[in-house]
Design a protein with these regions (language model features):
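Conserved NTP/Mg2+-binding pocket subregion across the NTase superfamily
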Residues: 2-8, 74-184, 191, 197
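A short N-terminal beta->alpha junction/helix N-cap motif
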Residues: 6, 10-14, 59-63, 194
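Conserved functional hotspot residues or short segments at active or partner-binding sites
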Residues: 188-191, 206
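Catalytic metal-binding acidic patch
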Residues: 39-41, 45-74, 89-94
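Short, charged amphipathic alpha-helical segments flanked by flexible coils
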Residues: 205-212
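Helical scaffold of the NTase/Pol beta-like nucleotidyltransferase catalytic core
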Residues: 1-36, 68-69
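Short secondary-structure boundary/capping segments within folded domains
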Residues: 26-31, 45-50, 84
Length: 212
């Protein structure tokens, strides 16, 4: 396996310690079902800071067994309990490698850790064209092969179609159910994300909120 551990995947020593511990524990549970571990999101595309979520992708040979899910639930509980603030800000999904490779297989449920959570749930949150593009083009390897070897190229127009659909779907959700978004945090969050999506749509590839 290439690059078992990248020694300094981020500029934050405490976060690097959390990530090393996390990957070691996951590998111990998955054994030969482990393919690789990667950072995506702001730690991949840039403009991260001390308040950023830590978005990860774990790639596996095949769907998780019941026993593996049980073991990983324990791992996430243990990592969340680490006395380092970064440990409570992990977010990501477990992708079977053939699902990750083909963007046509987007939208299905994966085992997912929500930001601030300590347990996995089924969710399609990360199973998108955008996440695949970021992993392929900018993914930060924590362990495993280079991410470009795991994801097929994604046409620019496919990416633009995804961005347009996200803008429309999210806009409809906000207008249909505005109450959860009627606060200072979400209003700023929405503006930043729409600026980013418009910027990405113009350029044809994803960037950071700051760039948007």
């Amino acid at each position: 396996m290439e690059n078992r551990h990248k020694p300094f995947p981020t500029p934050y020593p405490d976060l690097n310690r959390v990530l090393r511990d996390f990957v070691d524990r996951v590998q111990a549970v998955l054994s030969t079902n482990f393919v690789g571990a990667y950072l995506q999101g702001s730690f991949a595309v840039g403009d991260f800071d001390l308040h950023s979520d830590v978005d990860f992708i774990l790639v596996i040979e095949e769907e998780l067994s019941h026993e593996e899910v049980h073991g990983l639930q324990a791992v996430h509980e243990q990592i969340y309990g680490v006395d380092i603030p970064w440990a409570q800000h992990l977010e990501g999904s477990y992708f079977p490698k053939e699902v990750l490779r083909d963007h046509a297989r987007r939208g299905g449920l994966l085992w997912y850790l929500d930001h601030g959570s300590r347990s996995l749930i089924p969710s399609a949150h990360c199973n998108t064209v955008l996440v695949r593009w970021v992993i392929r083009e900018h993914g930060v390897t924590l362990a495993g092969p280079a991410p470009a070897r795991l994801v097929d190229p994604i046409p620019v127009e496919t990416l633009r179609e995804h961005i347009r659909a996200t803008m429309q779907d999210w806009g409809q959700e906000i207008l249909s159910h505005p109450d959860p978004f009627n606060n200072r945090f979400y209003q700023g969050f929405i503006v930043l994300n729409y600026c980013r999506m418009l910027h990405d749509l113009h350029r044809g590839f994803p960037g950071s909120k700051l760039a948007g």
